[in-house]
From Swiss-Prot:
Its main location: cytoplasm. This is Endonuclease V. It comes from Mus musculus (Mouse). InterPro entries: Endonuclease-V (IPR007581). The lineage of its organism: Eukaryota, Metazoa, Chordata, Craniata, Vertebrata. It comes from the Eukaryota. Residues 260-270, 287-323 have a biased composition (Basic and acidic residues). The keyword Cell membrane does not apply. Its EC number is 3.1.26.-.
Amino acid sequence: MAHTAAERPPEETLSLWKGEQARLKARVVDRDTEAWQRDPSFSGLQKVGGVDVSFVKGDSVRACASLVVLSYPELKVVYEDSRMVGLKAPYVSGFLAFREVPFLVELVQRLQEKEPDLMPQVVLVDGNGVLHQRGFGVACHLGVLTELPCIGVAKKLLQVDGLENNALHKEKIVLLQAGGDTFPLIGSSGTVLGMALRSHDHSTKPLYVSVGHRISLEVAVRLTHHCCRFRIPEPIRQADIRSREYIRRTLGQLGVAPAQRKDRSQKEQRPNACPQGGPGALADQGRPPECDGRDSSSDRKAPEPGFQEQKDQQLEGTGHQEDSDLWPPSPAWVQSPP
């Protein structure tokens, strides 16, 4: 039985949220604060984190929050923690953090208590940082609350401050010829809000990187590129894979039949555009990709559980399929979106 999140919060709540964002935004540090950030080869960086939230299909309440820590530069998972959570707030464009960040903060706190030696030195977040309606996206929110350096990595352009996914923007994307190529995202205000990054030689779709907390944009972009074995940075990619697998296992333990499970164990599908009314409007489920910079589930195919090592070994010796975020494609028992 599907669960539905609460209705749109009253305007008083949205006003309080805006005030909280403004208060926390004053604490954002958009410069390098760590010695490893100032080293061209990131000497001293050993642990990179990634976070993600996956949804039970057709259910806007039940979700899985996941935190992984990878060794650097090997990009091997050394820690993972996934938890089923109940989302109390609905999705409202521009306020994603109030829906998801509390659960991510809890995962960081659990890691600090259980394995403090494995605390990440930087966290890559599936979403935006200062590239946001009010300059304080989910990556900023998580960074300020945990005091960890954070990077926002989005797969869709958030169209704010005059940024548009128009013909000119598409022309700039075409000029990104190789992995590591970039162009700045300059708003109408003249502010550089982030960078478009071609993350992989075989991917034509850029990522949109922005500062979250305690890191400069230049270092954030360079590190994001260094973490990309495929299109999606490995910390976020692994958090996504493992959160989906955790949902599958959990549904199986609850006695959901495989035929039902395949319809419910993927990223929650999201509308194709911002809800009518623009930023701040309510979406029934999930996050419209153009609103918060996350892609639809079609770009996030899940591999077969237990297949990760074999897949990585195969890919290390073969060419990568163009624009595939999580290669190989989903097995037959995992439903792909229409």
